[in-house]
Design a protein with these regions (language model features):
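Nucleotide phosphate-binding/pyrophosphate-handling subdomain across enzymes
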Residues: 38, 133, 138-143, 149-162, ...
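Cofactor-binding loop segments of dinucleotide-utilizing enzymes, especially the Rossmann-like FAD-
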Residues: 73, 165, 200, 334-338, ...
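C-terminal helical cap/extension that packs against the catalytic core
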Residues: 201-210, 214-220, 303-304, 344-387
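Aromatic/hydrophobic pocket-lining residues that form π-stacking "cages" and hydrophobic walls in ligand
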Residues: 57, 127, 208
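Short functional linear segments
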Residues: 1-46, 53-66, 71, 107-114
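ATP-dependent carboxylate-amine ligase catalytic core
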Residues: 29-30, 34-37, 63-156, 172-174, ...
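Positively charged, low-complexity/disordered segments
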Residues: 389-391
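Acidic, Mg2+-coordinating active-site environments of NTP-dependent enzymes
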Residues: 109-112, 135-142, 158-250, 263, ...
Length: 391
C-alpha cells in the first residue's frame, strides 16, 4: 500500500471498529515484541493542556540530549505528527513501515477471531513500534480519551504521571460530572508512582488526591494561587511559580495565560525527575523558553491567531485571551467536529466577546459539523449588533 492508501485505510477504521479492551492492546503490543521495561514513561491525561505539557517536557529532554519519543493526538496536518522522535516527526517511510508491521499482527489476530483495533489503538501500536525501533529512552504518552480505559494505560510502571485541567467532556463516555471524569483521568495513577496535577478545580483535585493516597503515590498539586504574572507581551509571558520552597521565574513563548499552568506542571514534573534525568533547574528554565506547540493561541501572522479549543472550558480560556489581545472588535472564523458539544461552545463564544463578524466553515473532514447548524446556534445566542456569515 502507498502512503496515501495507508492514510485512507486508517481514516476508515472508525467506520468498522469499536474500542477494545486494554488486554487486546496488550496482546497486540506483545506480538510486536514491545515491552514496558524498554522505556521510561511519562504518562499525561486531562481535559485540556495535555499536549502543551508534553511539548514542554519533550523540549527539555531533547535539548538535554536524551533519546525521546512523543506520542500525542490529534494531528493538525498529517498523521506523522503524532509520532515525534528527538523533536522531529517520523518520516513517511517510517510511517509506512510501522503500518506494515502492525497490519501484519492485526491480520494474525483477526485470523484467530480477535477484533480489529480501533483507530486510536492502531495508531498507538504504530507509535510504539517506531519508538522501540528508534530505541528511545524516555517516552511521553498523551492519553486519547479519559485515562483508566485508554489504550495508553497498558503500562504498569511509568516513571511519573501528570493530570492537567479537568472539565466536562465526552460525558456520554466518561460520565456527566467532574467527579466521574476526574476518576477516569485518575485511572492513570499507579501504585507508588508520583503524580503531578492541576489543582484549579477543587472537586477534581480531591478525587485525584484520594486516588493517589489509595495508591500510595506521592502527589504534587499546582494551584492557580502559586502563579503570578510579571509581564505579557502578546507573544510571551513572564511569570513566577512558587510551590512553597522553590520559587522560579519562567518565560514561555505563548500569549495565552492558561499556558502558565501547563508550563508549571511540566516544570514540577521535571523537578521531581531531576535525580533521574540529571537536568538542573537552569537548564529546565532555558529549554522551556524554546518550546513550540502549534494551534494553541498560535500567532500565524500579525493579528491572526489559531486555537484548537474543543470544549467549553478550553473555549472559555480562548475567549479570555482574545479579550486581552484584541485591540479592536475581532473577527471569528469557527468550525467544530460533529461529536463535540457545539451548542455549549457557541454559548460561551457569544457571552463575552462582541465579535465584529463571525465566519462559519466546515473542517475538511467527514466529522466536521454543517455550518448551517452552527449558524442556527449562533443566531439563537447572538445579540442584535452581531453579524453572522457563513462560508
Amino acid at each position: 500500500m502507498t502512503y496515501e492508501e495507508i492514510c485512507n485505510y486508517i481514516y476508515e477504521i472508525p467506520k468498522f471498529t469499536k474500542k477494545n479492551s486494554l488486554e487486546h492492546t496488550k496482546e497486540m503490543l506483545q506480538r510486536l515484541s514491545i515491552r514496558e521495561h524498554q522505556f521510561e514513561i511519562i504518562h499525561v491525561a486531562g481535559s485540556n493542556g495535555k499536549g502543551s505539557v508534553c511539548a514542554f517536557i519533550n523540549q527539555v529532554l531533547v535539548e538535554h540530549g536524551c533519546e525521546v519519543g512523543l506520542f500525542t493526538s490529534p494531528h493538525l496536518v498529517c498523521m506523522e505528527e503524532r509520532f515525534v522522535i528527538n523533536g522531529k516527526k517520523c518520516s513517511q517511510e517510517e510511517f509506512v513501515e510501522s503500518f506494515e508491521a502492525v497490519q501484519k499482527v492485526v491480520g494474525q489476530m483477526e485470523a484467530e477471531g480477535l477484533p480489529h483495533p480501533a483507530f486510536f489503538e492502531y495508531l498507538f501500536a504504530m507509535g510504539m513500534y517506531l519508538f522501540q525501533k528508534r530505541k528511545v529512552h524516555y517516552l511521553i504518552l498523551e492519553t486519547g480519551l479519559g485515562g483508566r480505559l485508554d489504550a495508553t494505560n497498558v503500562f504498569e510502571e511509568p516513571l511519573l504521571t501528570i493530570i492537567t485541567s479537568i472539565s466536562l467532556e465526552h460525558t456520554q463516555i466518561l460520565g456527566d460530572s467532574i467527579e466521574a471524569i476526574a476518576g477516569e483521568k485518575a485511572g492513570i495513577i499507579k501504585e507508588g508512582v508520583p503524580v503531578i496535577f492541576d489543582g484549579s478545580n477543587e472537586t477534581a483535585a480531591e478525587v485525584i488526591r484520594q486516588t493517589a493516597r489509595a495508591k500510595r503515590a506521592p502527589y504534587y498539586c499546582i494551584s492557580l494561587e502559586s502563579l503570578k504574572i510579571h509581564k505579557i507581551t502578546g507573544k510571551t509571558i513572564d511569570f513566577c511559580y512558587s510551590n512553597g520552597y522553590d520559587v522560579v521565574d519562567l518565560k514561555i513563548p505563548f500569549p495565552a495565560e492558561y499556558q502558565m499552568m501547563n508550563a508549571s506542571l511540566a516544570y514540577r514534573a521535571l523537578s521531581v525527575l531531576q535525580v533521574e534525568t540529571g537536568i538542573g533547574k537552569a537548564e529546565i528554565i532555558s529549554a522551556m523558553e524554546h518550546t513550540r506547540w502549534m494551534g494553541r493561541m498560535q500567532q500565524a501572522e500579525p493579528f491572526i491567531y489559531f486555537d484548537g479549543a474543543h470544549n467549553a472550558d478550553g473555549i472559555a480560556h480562548f475567549v479570555k485571551n482574545v479579550q486581552k489581545i484584541a485591540e479592536e472588535k475581532p473577527v471569528l472564523l469557527f468550525s467544530m467536529m460533529e461529536e463535540k458539544n457545539y451548542k455549549e461552545a457557541v454559548k460561551v463564544l457569544c457571552q463575552e466577546v462582541a465579535w465584529d463578524s463571525i465566519v462559519l466553515t466546515r473542517i475538511p473532514d467527514s466529522r466536521g459539523i454543517d455550518p448551517l447548524k452552527l449558524q442556527d446556534e449562533f443566531m439563537a445566542n447572538r445579540s442584535e449588533e452581531r453579524r453572522v456569515g457563513k462560508e
